[in-house]
């Protein structure tokens, strides 16, 4: 009986009826009636939701067997060193490179190791006002009011605090947003890391050299290139699978991209576990053909 399976699952994972209701997109009353065998009509649709929940959990259990711990590759060390320097010296440094090379993972790892580091993740909708509010909320400054008021509050909070402000996907920032970053740096001596795609470096110069003041303040620009070296990819593969047995097949299939490698290994691990079989070069090749990027 599916209701009993759900009860067992809830007990094992200490889940409340409210949590289940959220997952099922139903009311708490519906969950309660279902668990107690008092749901007034056919429960087939709820049984299917239980099946889906259990299947997702099984997939997560398999995922747990994939080691996604941070790996200090040579590329990662270069990025971390650039962040350390910006943090210690109060400099503006840049980390740029193609998608899928591990920029975001470096930023997150640095945050784990340094509580004084601030990470701001931006998206295409991030206007100057949104950016300032994000920074203000992250550092505990006042996020209300006009931009100049929010900026003043941020400056007051960061001045002399020896923090490191890191902006991920900084190539999405407008000229005005980048000017606010420069102003925060100038007024606080706070270290800044701008991380993003290669066009970030072009954006920092400005189409008409209007960001000359910002560009002149950049200390170092760490170019990660378009692909990771094989030695880095080998380290990532061995760490994730706890073996180097499949490195040749994986490195050939991932095309120098860490994100592609991660997707490939996750798929292979999941397939092997679900089908109760061993990972093989043939399986890796099969999965690599399904990857879009």
Write out the residue ranges for each language-model feature:
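C-terminal alpha-helical "lid" subdomain
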Residues: 1-48, 52, 223-293
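Conserved adenine-nucleotide phosphate-binding loops and their immediately adjacent elements
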Residues: 59-72
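Pre-Walker A adenine-sensing motif
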Residues: 70-87
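Sensor-1/coupling segment of RecA-like P-loop NTPase cores
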Residues: 94-99, 184-211
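Conserved catalytic segments around the Walker B and adjacent sensor/switch elements
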Residues: 114-124
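A short helix-turn-beta junction within AAA+ P-loop NTPase domains corresponding to the substrate/partner-engaging
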Residues: 115-117, 207-226
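Mid-core helix/loop region of P-loop NTP-binding domains shared across ATPases and GTPases
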Residues: 127-133, 142-191, 209, 227-237, ...
